[in-house]
Each structure stands twice: as C-alpha cells, then as structure tokens.
C-alpha cells in the first residue's frame, strides 16, 4: 500500500507540459468531486433510495505571481508572445482538449521539489482557464489565477484515467 504524505503542508512546484510555472501566492488547491444522481421513488417520498455515479470533476487552482510571459502564454486562451510582448485574441470555440497537457504538482522539501516520486500529483490531461486580476497599485501583487480542469486521458498509457498520486511517469 502506498504511503503518500497527504499530511504534509507547504508549497509545491507546478509544471504544465514540462514548463515550470514559477511562483504562486495564495496556495495551490486540488479538488476532486464525484458527481451523483440521487434515486428516489414516489412511494418513498424524498427519501434517497440509491445513488448513481454520473462522473467526476477534478481541478487544480493555481494563483501565479511574478510570472514571465513565456510561462503564462500557454495558459491564457488566444495568447501569443512575440518580440514586443504578448497579444491576446478572442478564443471563442476553442476546445479544451486541444490545449490540455499534463500537469504535475511536486511537494517542495527544503526549498526544492522533492525527488521522491511518491510526492507528486498528476493530472494526465489538464485544460487551463485563466482568470486575470491584475491590480496596478503600490500595495498588492498581481495574480494570474489559472484553473486546470482534469479531462480523461485519451492518448497515452493512461486512457480514461484523470489523475494519480505518485510516480508521474
């Protein structure tokens, strides 16, 4: 039986498509929720008699700060970095699977990512959605919140799987 250190606290390194996304501010949050339908009968009123699993939703919220354009280009739909900066175009109709890549979170130990493969969480296919809230003042940090939605893998040895704790290979 695996002994993943879920009780540990502290930051993690985040890599999307093998690109280190850099610093975070406010905590990285992983969520996984099983979606169910409740089964009831007219004869038993509102009493739930059974449940049926409809699927699951996995996501990771990553509040990035002090980012370089090259780090966030692939996270902002319609973004392209050129020699003059970054330009963002409308991305209406963009399918998430077309930009989804592997997301790896690795627990930090003594200021560096752990080399223990058991201290990783992997979303095999993660579709990034950015929510930019950049303040321009003298008292706050600019945060680019990116939510990665886990999609079932469709192109590797993990077909149908969404995430794992442990060795990212």
Q: Positions of the model-derived regions?
A:
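Short, structured patches in soluble enzyme cores that scaffold and shape functional sites
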Residues: 64, 107-109, 150-152
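Short linear motifs in intrinsically disordered
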Residues: 1-7, 88-99
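Hydrophobic beta-strand residues in large extracellular and virion-surface proteins
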Residues: 14, 60, 103-105, 165
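Phosphate/anion-contacting hairpin/loop surfaces
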Residues: 92-115, 123
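Solvent-exposed edge beta-strands and adjacent loop segments
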Residues: 1-74, 125-144
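Mixed-charge, glycine-accented linear interaction segment located at domain edges/termini
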Residues: 119-169
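Short, surface-exposed beta-strand/loop "edge" segments at domain boundaries and coil↔beta transitions
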Residues: 71, 108-118, 156-158
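Charged, amphipathic alpha-helical segments
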Residues: 67-93
């Amino acid at each position: 039986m695996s002994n993943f250190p879920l009780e540990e606290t502290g930051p993690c390194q985040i890599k999307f498509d093998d690109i280190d996304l850099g610093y975070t501010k406010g905590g990285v949050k992983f969520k996984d929720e099983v979606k169910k339908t409740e089964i009831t009968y007219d004869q038993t009123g509102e009493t739930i008699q059974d449940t049926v699993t409809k699927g699951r939703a996995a996501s990771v919220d990553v509040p990035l700060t002090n980012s370089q354009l090259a780090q966030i280009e692939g996270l902002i739909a319609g973004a392209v970095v050129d020699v003059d900066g970054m330009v963002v175009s409308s991305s209406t109709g963009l399918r998430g699977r077309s930009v989804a890549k592997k997301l790896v979170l690795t627990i930090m130990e003594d200021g560096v990512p752990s080399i223990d493969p058991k201290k990783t969480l992997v979303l095999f296919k993660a579709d990034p959605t950015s929510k930019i809230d950049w303040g321009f003042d003298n008292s706050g940090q600019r945060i680019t919140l990116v939510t990665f939605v886990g999609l079932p893998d469709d192109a590797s040895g993990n077909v149908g799987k969404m995430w794992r704790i442990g060795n990212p290979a």
